[in-house]
Amino acid sequence: MKLPVFALSLIAAFSCLADEPKLEPLFNGKDLAGFKTEGSTEFWRVENGVLIGENNAAKKGNYLWTEKEYGDFVIEFDVRWKGTTPRGVDTGIEMRKPNIQLQLGISGSLKVDMSGSWYTGKPLGYPEAGQAKEAKTLMKPEGEWNTFRIQAKGNTFTCWINGQKASEYTDAKFSGAAPLGLQIHPGVEMKCEYRNMRLAPL
């Protein structure tokens, strides 16, 4: 028996939904439960359901880490930021061992916006294969909310910005499970806000 085209479309749609990982809240919108920080907590606070990291030019940097470790996962969140100096905002999301970072804002070393690009540390820094060269066309202006989706699966790291694929990078070196870290870069006057943080292990 042949199925109508409409029925086949429904089956395909439900199949896609079944394959979609179930994202659960990573941040409760009330406090820093489930996270830990190195040293002082003065860099981090929660206001009106928003997780805020803030620094000034005189302060050292800081990381806010998840208490749990993650290997293969997908995470979605809304983020907006504002820098009050010419250097702008320099932050990112750390993951895996040894740490690989998804850059948010201006790279301190390159002095250009590398949002959505993968930073692997020295000697490569931002390998060309992992750069989000079209990120500026995908993102809303500074100060507005942008939705990021990050997936770490096997040796491949993928980033989507506002629903559009921005970068993909493959590197077998970053294989160990580790906490996720939100960065506040040292010596930069900046504010970065997160909301609707949801994650699913894969």
Locate each region found by the language model:
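Bacterial N-terminal signal peptides
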Residues: 5-15
